Curated annotation (Swiss-Prot):
Biological processes, Gene Ontology terms: compound eye morphogenesis; mitotic cleavage furrow ingression; positive regulation of protein localization; regulation of Golgi organization
Membrane-spanning ranges: none
Recorded GO CC terms: apical part of cell; cytoplasm; microvillus; nucleus; plasma membrane
Residue ranges constituting the SH3 domain according to the UniProt record: 1091-1155
Subcellular location: Cytoplasm; Nucleus; Cell membrane; Cell projection, Microvillus
UniProt keyword annotation of Nucleus present: yes
Lineage: Eukaryota, Metazoa, Ecdysozoa, Arthropoda, Hexapoda
Major subcellular site: cytoplasm
Classification via CDD domains: ArfGap_ASAP, BAR_ASAPs, PH_ASAP, SH3_ASAP
Record's compositionally biased regions (Acidic residues): 709-719
Statement: the UniProt record of this protein carries the keyword Endoplasmic reticulum: no
Stated name of the protein: ArfGAP with SH3 domain, ANK repeat and PH domain-containing protein
Length: 1155
């Protein structure tokens, strides 16, 4: 039964009963009711506190406005007194006396108003202010804190005695489940009396406060009523007394007006007589009503020039000099240029002419001179005279035409005509924003009426009433524009596309409760609420204890590209310009966001730019150290260095200083020119020319829903939300459900720089059952690592923007989980490298319980030992968020299998982001000196290699189980946990890396996380070239057709001559660990040998679902090119006799023929 309220009389009766007879009292049973009652009373006091605060504000506003009214009335009194005194001096005593009488009445009424304002201050505001500063001071819960302490002491003592009684009963061999309060009444008497005393004290204070806020406040309001009544009575008495004089004054004014009308008629008659005189000479310069209405007044329609005269002209004109002594006409040569200027030459034409900008001039004809015209500039007028009237019209027409042309050109340059596709993109983005959760109503008041106003820096939609309050806050708090009236550019919509009203209110109104605005709220209420929400941030839930926590969360938000987390830290007061905690180079969140921006996190960059202090845009990193390549780089320097053109647009449009220099004394423009980033160079040049229209539109992956259902996309151009159910499982390990994914959802293909898709969902990986998961706590986003596709794109187009991928959720790692992984791998090593049937029996339950994880990069280590020469190449990436476990654990894993000789080469680094020698702090910006991946360059740390799948297939449960056991693969998978798939590209247009990353080892190849067999060929899908080893001096090979030769006896890799692989498109070689005859000799000296191609017959008709699948009919003969693909239920082959028909086919559709 829930506790109920206890009345004061009941409390007194229960307390007296307990005081007289503690053992028979029932007070202990009513103590929960007392606590509940105190809580309810505290809520009522909080409501009274809020009500009195608002009452005080209202009374204070009335008092201030009333005093202002009194002051203005006194100004009026003094003006009337001066006016009356002046009229009396002009022999008009009646009118002067009336002015003075009005001043006296106004003064008396003003005195009454002043008395009323004093009364409202003394009678109402002073008592209310006293209550708020005495009884109701502090915050909710302050007054009942002594009661809470007494209740806590009572409960602690009761629990202690209860434990003692139960222990005594247990020693006596009895079981005591409950302790009666009467049994411990005597022992608890002190605590119970204190509880009763504090309750009594609280009730006394409560009654005193309710008396003051109720009865006494109403008595004060009664006094105010009497004061108000006296004010109106005295005022009415003054007005009535003045009313008698008003009647007399009206009669006097009527008489005075009649006399003035007689005088006016006499003057009019006299004027008529004078004008009728025959020999009267009229004076032309006397203005009449007609001349005032016409003439050289302002004309709405300006001069129109004759287009036949063109926009250029030169010749001689007479110009009137501006001398102080004498003004003469001087003949000067003049020239009108097509760019909107008039050049006036001097008498000595060798001097440079005076140039007048026609855009700031006005051309006017001279009414009295048909050959003359005036040119009015911003600082002086020019008076010209042509040879004749025709010449004058020609000059004026040319001047007007040239001015119109310059004006049209200026308007077109300021707002260039956008292409229809760009206009459609704007409309589509706006429609998408309006459909976001919560955007159908005002973010602040919930109104559905005219929700067409957007706050650009918050990305929310508000109604027209709330938009006015946002404007009052100032642009440093909220930048308001209209979706319908303003021409919003795509750069204005970046934050709005990623935010939404619901997302913002979940954070900014987390502690609001029931006090939200309503659509019928007044403007005063809107102002108070919106200011408290956005300026004071009063309703934000605090999640960080200090500034260091805020800085850590800020860095995490940028790393994860998490807009909600970024908004949270901003709302909690984080300094967006502070140095990040893990940076030794002094990088801010903006530096990190720019470095990690690959095309899909521009909203993070824009939010930082728009909501940080202006000085943060130009904040530079620390000066360069002894081992650093460069230092003192601003965000604009990093954009120029790494070709972040879209980030540069956002920075330049917000006013970033492009003239700042780094430690190498280079500006961003110098760096862009040096690096060959022409797009960045052009953007900075536009900023220098003040051509800000170049920054209006952003090229990014908007990730908008496709409204045209007929549009056909290939598999690697579509992204399906990983959270939705799938029709077939993907071809990589892990997943939400092994049977609910379609292969088209595996958006792990390596996108080229022109790919429209950037937001691929985060990948999921699994370890064998019993192996604990671990991920690095940096909360990795794929922006942390540069994808192979971006490198392939950068080989031909340095300025290409590689697409980004969505961030994955962060999680923490522990050394225990790493050691558990090592132990599990040791067990697998003892079992050997081949897979038994039991390995394939992983339960579906285990697969469904898998968690998302990312593979951390191994820490730096020393490579090249004779017993373990396996080391992994890596793509360049900022290392400081990825090394979260001990190097000893990784070395123990890598060195477990002594017979492995696999060496994975490193992709050549194109202006790669290197790790700072300081060990995890900051970002260096040099070029890697180890393109061959030998491990002996500047970046010789042990890093994970990019693992690729050449074919996106939908495996059965068996192959999925096979891929799930990638325990050791976490050391070679990409740090972001992605398994990218190659996209079909034009090989002739690409410069390939020297040694691309290896393909994924299957479970049969895994032993202690490393491969003990030859690496299978990398499948590109439609293309299946053979592989052969050539000298390293050859050109870069095709990335999709890479083979490495391994020695099963542990001979190791020959480092003296690093190998490269060239490719052709005829057929494909394959090596199998089960057939040693297919592998060559030890080391690099051995070649791959192929003993023959297997053939199979089609059992059924097969229709291709994807462009890389083979379509065939029943009975056709297929030649197998590759038996071992990333999905063991699929092979690659061609139709016999038809080599153009090539692709992947399911094993279950064919019957293998004997060799």
């Amino acid at each position: 039964m829930p506790p109920s309220l206890i009345a004061v009389s009941e409390f007194v009766e229960e307390t007296r009963s307990d005081y007289s007879s503690p053992t028979t009292s029932t007070f202990a049973s009513r103590m929960p009711d007392c606590r509940h009652t105190i809580g309810v009373l505290e809520e009522r006091l909080e409501f009274d506190r809020e009500g009195l605060t608002k009452l005080k504000k209202a009374v204070k506003a009335i008092h201030n406005s009333g005093n202002t009214h009194v002051d203005n009335e006194m100004f009026m009194v003094r003006a009337l007194e001066r006016l009356g005194g002046k009229v009396i001096e002009q022999d008009e005593p009646d009118i002067g006396a009336a002015f003075l009488k009005f001043s006296v009445v106004t003064k008396e009424l003003s005195a009454l108003m002043k008395t009323l304002m004093q009364n409202i201050n003394n009678i109402v505001m002073f008592p209310v202010d006293s209550m708020l500063k005495s009884e109701l001071r502090g915050v909710k819960g302050d007054m009942k804190r002594p009661f809470d302490k007494a209740a806590k002491d009572y409960e602690a003592k009761f629990i202690k005695i209860e434990k003692e009684k139960k222990a005594q009963a247990k020693e006596a061999g009895m079981v005591r489940t409950e302790i009666d309060a009467a049994v411990v009444a005597e022992e608890m008497e002190k605590e119970r009396r204190l509880y009763q005393l504090q309750t009594c004290e609280y009730l006394l204070k409560y009654k005193d406060i309710k008396t003051k806020t109720g009865i006494e406040l109403l008595q004060h309001l009664i006094e105010y009523y009497h004061a108000l009544s006296n004010y109106f009575k005295d005022g009415l008495q003054t007005i009535e007394h003045f009313g008698t004089y008003i009647g007399d004054l009206s009669e006097k004014l009527h008489e005075i007006k009649q006399k003035q009308d007689e005088d006016r008629r006499s003057l009019l008659d006299l004027r008529t007589v004078l004008r009728s005189t025959p020999d009267f000479e009229r004076v032309d310069n006397v203005p009449s009503s007609e001349s005032r209405s016409g003439g050289a007044g302002y004309s709405l329609h300006q001069l129109q020039g004759d287009k036949h005269h063109g926009v250029t002209r030169q010749g001689h004109l007479l110009k009137k000099s501006e001398g102080k002594v004498r003004r003469v006409w001087q003949k000067r040569r003049c020239r009108v240029t097509s760019d909107g200027f008039l050049d006036i030459f001097h008498a000595d034409e060798s001097k440079p002419p005076t140039r007048v900008n026609l855009l700031t001039c006005q051309i006017k004809p001279v009414p009295d001179d048909k050959r003359g015209f005036d040119l009015i500039s911003y600082n002086r007028p020019y008076h010209f005279q042509a040879e004749d009237e025709g010449d004058q019209k020609a000059w004026m027409a040319v001047l007007v035409n040239c001015k119109e042309k310059a004006l049209t050109k200026a308007f077109q340059h300021a707002n260039p005509q956008m292409s229809p596709s760009l206009v459609e993109l704007q409309k589509t983005v706006i429609r998408y924003v309006q459909l976001l959760p919560g955007n159908d109503r005002c973010c602040d008041c919930g109104s559905r009426n005219d929700v067409t106003w957007i706050s650009l820096n918050f990305g929310i939609l508000v109604c027209i009433q709330c938009s006015g309050v946002h404007r009052d806050l100032g642009v440093h708090h909220s930048r308001i524009q209209s979706l319908t009236l303003d021409n919003l550019t795509t750069a204005n919509l970046l934050i709005a596309r990623a935010m939404g009203n619901s997302t913002l209110n979940d954070i900014m109104e987390a502690k609001l409760g029931r006090g939200k605005l309503q659509h019928e709220s007044s403007m005063e209420e809107r102002y108070d609420f919106i200011r408290a929400k956005y300026v004071a941030k009063r309703y934000v839930m605090r999640t960080c204890s200090d500034d260091n926590d805020l800085r850590c969360d800020l860095e995490q938000a940028v790393v994860n590209a998490d807009m909600s987390q970024l908004l949270q830290v901003w709302a909690e007061g984080a300094d967006l310009t502070c140095c990040l905690p893990s940076s030794d180079a002094g990088e801010t969140a903006l530096h990190l966001a720019v470095l990690r921006e690959m095309g899909s996190t521009l909203h993070i960059v824009d939010f930082l730019i728009q909501n940080m202090p202006p000085k943060g845009l130009n904040k530079a990193t620390n000066p360069a150290g002894l081992l650093d390549v460069t230092g003192k780089n601003t965000a604009l320097h990093l954009c120029a260095l790494h070709d972040r053109r879209e980030c540069m647009k956002l920075l330049l449009r917000s006013g970033a200083d492009y003239e700042l220099k780094n430690s190498q004394n280079k500006t961003a423009l110098d760096i862009a020119k040096e690096m060959g980033h022409n797009s960045c160079r052009e953007l900075i040049e536009c900023a220098i020319k003040r051509e800000k229209s170049a920054f209006d539109h952003i090229n990014t992956d908007w990730n908008l829903p496709n409204e045209d259902g007929s549009t056909d996309f290939s598999d690697d151009e579509t992204v399906i939300d990983e959270r939705k159910s799938r029709s077939r499982p993907p071809s990589f390990a892990g997943g939400d459900s092994p049977v609910l994914r379609s292969r088209s959802s595996t958006c792990d293909s390596i996108q080229s720089s022109s790919s429209p898709i950037a937001n691929c969902p985060s990948r999921q990986f699994t370890l064998p059952s019993g192996l604990p998961s671990y991920t690095h706590s940096a909360g990795t986003s794929p922006k942390q690592h540069i994808s192979v596709g971006q490198y392939l794109g950068s080989a031909t187009n340095v300025g290409g923007n590689g697409p980004g991928n969505g961030g994955s959720s962060p999680s923490s790692a522990s050394s225990q989980s790493v050691r558990a992984a090592r132990n599990s791998l040791n067990m697998q090593s003892d079992l050997g490298g081949h897979v038994t049937g039991a390995r394939k029996s992983t339960s579906t339950a285990n697969m469904n319980s898998l968690k998302k994880r990312t593979a951390p990069a191994p820490p730096p280590g020393t490579l090249g030992s004779a017993s373990s020469s396996s080391f992994y190449g890596t793509l360049p990436h900022p290392p400081r968020h990825s090394q979260n476990f001990d190097a000893s654990d990784i070395r123990a894993i890598n060195h477990k299998n002594q017979s492995l000789d696999v060496a994975y080469g490193t992709l050549p680094h194109l202006r790669s982001v290197e790790s700072s020698p300081r060990g995890g702090g900051g970002y260096g910006y040099g070029v890697s000196q180890d393109p061959g991946g030998s491990g002996n360059g500047s970046n010789n740390s042990l890093m994970p290699a990019m693992t690729t799948f050449g074919h996106k297939r939908s495996p059965s449960g068996e192959s999925l189980n096979r891929n799930i056991h990638l325990a050791g693969a976490k050391l070679v998978l990409p740090p972001t946990g992605e398994l990218p798939t190659l996209k079909h590209v034009d090989k002739s247009a690409l410069t390939r890396p020297k040694i691309p990353p290896p393909g994924p080892p299957s479970e049969r190849e895994i032993s202690n996380g490393q491969s003990n067999e030859s690496i299978s060929s990398m499948d590109e899908g439609p293309v299946a070239p053979p592989r052969k080893l050539v000298n390293q001096s050859a050109n870069f090979p095709d990335y999709e057709s890479w083979h490495t030769d391994m020695d099963s006896s542990g001979g190791g890799l020959d480092h003296s001559a690093e190998s490269n692989v060239s490719s052709s498109d005829n057929d494909r070689l394959n090596s199998s660990p089960d057939n040693p005859s297919k592998t060559g000799g030890a080391g690099l000296g051995g070649k791959f040998h192929y003993n023959g191609q297997r053939r199979c017959r089609a059992l059924y008709d097969c229709v291709a679902d994807n462009d890389d699948e083979l379509e065939f009919k029943e009975g056709e003969i297929l030649i197998v090119l590759n038996e071992r693909t990333d999905d063991e239920n699929w092979m690659e082959g061609i139709i016999e006799g038809q080599p153009t028909r090539k692709g992947m086919f399911p094993v279950s559709f064919v019957h293998m023929l004997p060799d």
